[in-house]
């Protein structure tokens, strides 16, 4: 598969600056590519059988895996990562799958540089997902945390600031939840409990 990925990157005009096999099932690429159409780029790469992009960004890298925080840190040498901020979440899945796709953090596919970790439950997940899918968004899992990432990224794609997108989520998302968002230059946190019908 790696050979096919490399050939596809070359066909698309992407120049590989650095590549690293972090684990037998994981590759990390740093590429130079004209990112006018990230959706087309990601769809071409993911059309390769058995290949999935777990994150893609100019300034933000999402590292996802199964295991506790120390295991993931050791696997990916996170103690050597240089950056200004990070978010992470070790959790026990209760509603979603237990696989790398469903692990936190989530990015706003196909919009780079927006990442989310979340605790809680969205009660209007399927309604919001259908709305976003009808706008052309694609989901990699059935985890409601991913919906928050796509929701915020879609708002920012249309000109909202992180703060504005998060404020819009107060009326657009329903449930009891807390989430953190990281962008290339910002961090945001929101704690929300839906008003009681008696209020």
Residue ranges of predicted features:
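Conserved small/polar residues in nucleotide/adenosyl-binding loops
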Residues: 192-199
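Short, flexible micro-motifs
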Residues: 123, 127, 178, 198
């Amino acid at each position: 598969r790696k050979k096919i990925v490399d050939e596809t990157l070359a066909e698309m005009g992407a120049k590989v600056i650095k590549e690293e096999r972090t684990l037998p099932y994981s590759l990390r690429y740093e590429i130079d590519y004209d990112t006018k159409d990230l959706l087309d780029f990601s769809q071409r790469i993911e059309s390769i059988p058995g290949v999935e992009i777990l994150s893609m960004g100019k300034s933000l890298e999402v590292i996802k895996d199964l295991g506790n925080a120390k295991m993931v840190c050791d696997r990916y040498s996170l103690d050597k990562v240089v950056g200004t901020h990070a978010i992470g979440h070790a959790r026990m899945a209760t509603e979603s799958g237990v696989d790398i796709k469903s692990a936190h953090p989530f990015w706003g596919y196909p919009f780079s540089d927006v990442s989310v970790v979340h605790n809680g439950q969205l009660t209007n997940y399927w309604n919001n997902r259908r709305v976003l899918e009808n706008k052309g968004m694609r989901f990699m899992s059935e985890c409601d945390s991913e919906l928050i990432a796509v929701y915020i990224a879609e708002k920012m794609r249309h000109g909202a600031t992180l703060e504005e997108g998060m404020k819009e989520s107060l009326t657009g998302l329903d449930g009891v939840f807390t989430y953190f968002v990281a962008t290339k230059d910002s961090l945001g946190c929101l704690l929300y409990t839906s008003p009681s019908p008696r209020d």
